[in-house]
Amino acid sequence: MVNQVAQCFTVRRVWLVVVVGLLVHQTTARYVFEECPGVMGNRALHGKVTRVCEDCYNVFRDTDVLAGCRKGCFSSEMFKLCLLAMERVEEFPDFKRWIGILNAGR
């Protein structure tokens, strides 16, 4: 009897973990989609642009920098400042084109 109760609790815990995991995953995906409507099918571009913000955050260690860089699907002034700080200004035309693709549908 005790073994059956323990099994029941184990099964319930597994289901709880699965449900919470799915909810968190869907919320994260929804945030990325709302912030950058063109990200679907363009994950590689999104990764390249996101990398600039992550590198900038790693240099300055300020969460406001990371949030500001990503704001408006990378259309913020902070993103340009991060490109400058990462010494990637010569790549700005490429990033501008990629950000335009990620912002498609706005």
Curated annotation (Swiss-Prot):
Main localization is secreted
Q: Does the keyword Disulfide bond apply?
A: yes
Q: Which residue ranges make up the pro-region?
A: 105-106
| Record keywords, A-Z | Amidation, Disulfide bond, Hormone, Neuropeptide, Secreted, Signal
Secretion signal span: 1-29
Instruction: Identify the tissues in which this protein is expressed.
Output: Sinus gland of the eyestalk.
PROSITE patterns of this UniProt entry?
Answer: CHH_MIH_GIH
Q: Where are the Alanine amide residues found in this chain?
A: 104
> Where would you find this protein in the cell?
Secreted
- Please cite one Gene Ontology biological process associated with this protein: circadian rhythm
Q: Which InterPro entries match?
A: Crust_neurhormone_CS, Crust_neurohorm, Crust_neurohorm_sf, Hyperglycemic, Hyperglycemic2
Pfam families according to UniProt: Crust_neurohorm
Return the GO cellular component terms, semicolon-separated. extracellular region
Cystine links in this protein are 36-73, 53-69, 56-82
- GO molecular function terms attached to this record: neuropeptide hormone activity
Q: What does this protein do?
A: Inhibits Y-organs where molting hormone (ecdysteroid) is secreted. A molting cycle is initiated when MIH secretion diminishes or stops.
Per the record, the similarity remark reads:
Belongs to the arthropod CHH/MIH/GIH/VIH hormone family.
Q: What is this protein called?
A: Molt-inhibiting hormone
Native species of this protein?
Answer: Faxonius limosus
